Amino acid sequence: MAVADWEEARGRMLLDPTVVNLNTGSGGPLPRSAFERVTGFRAHLAAEPMDFLLREVPALLWQARESLARLIGGDPLRLALATNVTAAVNLVASSLRLEAPGEILLSDDEYTPMRWCWERVARRHGLELRTFRLPELPSDPAEITAAAVAAMGPRTRLFFFSHVVSTTGLILPAAELCEEARARGITTVVDGAHAPGFLDLDLSRIPCDFYAGSGHKWLLAPTGVGFLHLAPGRLEELEPTQVSWAYEPPEGSGPPAARDRFGSTPGLRRLECEGTRDICPWLATPESIDFQAELGPGAIRARRRELTDHARRLLADRPGRTLLTPDSPELSGGMVAYRLPPGTDAAELRRGLWERFRIEAAVAEQPPGPVLRISANFYTTEEEIDRLADALDALTGE
């Protein structure tokens, strides 16, 4: 897709023209077509619930499962749909029986609720939670692999890490990390919250046991889209967080790993079914996937790179700011993060960006100091990044 077409693509997004949106890493806006699709499904659900749920949903659900599986290089028969990464990871964490004494290994920069999740597992099972330090501004993915491998040992029962680190946008070498863990008999759980739509994701090349992803960020799918992709043979280890109608498959459902009449498989549906609820976001996911396919995923990634390079050039020459995201395309994508000067109040800065300048950007306390993360996507403009730079100067007195 030519650069000149990005303005047209921006016009196809639901964007508030008064807001500079630099926070796709927390939640992406919807393409208008995806909004119309999910709204249409909800209108049918509201008007005639049983017709929609019993007669329309099964085919739509299987279509969504297949579409998402193709995008991520997965198997639809091993792809459980979920609300988000948090739900998917907690499903795994609440199900696995890890041998004690032993250890759960994490990187030192994981999403806080996920760290809490594994801390709870460690307490319940009598395990130790250990972290390894991610290299600062690595120039080669092998540096990350070496740091993780050095922390693995005979007591390591499970290794959890983010494919893309939320704080900095650092991309971890997921395939290599999972290969090293598997060679040592260590179960792997990967937090892929940022990966769908952000990376050229191919789960067939990542030998992980459990891979969780979200759709409401870079995939630009409706809020409420997540997934859990399972390695062969791991489904039987999982128990649903809620017992509902799919807990015992109805007579004639067929094998646990075969497509059923509900748009799932008996094994997957057991994990997915939470009673009557709104799964319209799942059903609308193909629209978001098709939208980005039309623009060209490679072109989108290249455009993000142009925008983050512009942000790097613009923000580099400011005293007190420390770059936290590597420059290598192997290690970074559409996000770039900076450590802000000591004494900066993260909450006040974020409030000032929004209230004075209508800029949405992630600013958070992250010891040893606050971090600003810029998430640029194809609908971002260079002028918007210029506005951020000017706003930062105004708010920090530079």
Curated annotation (Swiss-Prot):
EC number(s) stated in the UniProt entry for this protein: 5.1.1.17
Pathway: Antibiotic biosynthesis; cephalosporin C biosynthesis
GO molecular function, one term: isopenicillin-N epimerase activity
InterPro entries registered for this protein in UniProt: Aminotrans_V_dom, Aminotrans_V_PyrdxlP_BS, PyrdxlP-dep_Trfase, PyrdxlP-dep_Trfase_major, PyrdxlP-dep_Trfase_small
Modification N6-(pyridoxal phosphate)lysine occurs at: K217
Listed transmembrane segments: none
SUPFAM superfamilies (UniProt xref): PLP-dependent transferases
Enzyme class: isomerase
Isomerase is among the record's keywords: yes
Reactions catalysed: isopenicillin N = penicillin N
Cofactors required: pyridoxal 5'-phosphate
UniProt-listed Pfam families: Aminotran_5
Gene3D superfamilies: Aspartate Aminotransferase, domain 1, Type I PLP-dependent aspartate aminotransferase-like (Major domain)
Keyword Mitochondrion annotated: no
GO biological process annotation, one example: antibiotic biosynthetic process
Superkingdom: Bacteria
Keywords in alphabetical order: Antibiotic biosynthesis, Isomerase, Pyridoxal phosphate
Family: Belongs to the class-V pyridoxal-phosphate-dependent aminotransferase family.
Job description of the protein: Catalyzes the reversible isomerization between isopenicillin N and penicillin N.
Name of the protein in question: Isopenicillin N epimerase
Phylogenetic classification of the source organism: Bacteria, Bacillati, Actinomycetota, Actinomycetes, Kitasatosporales
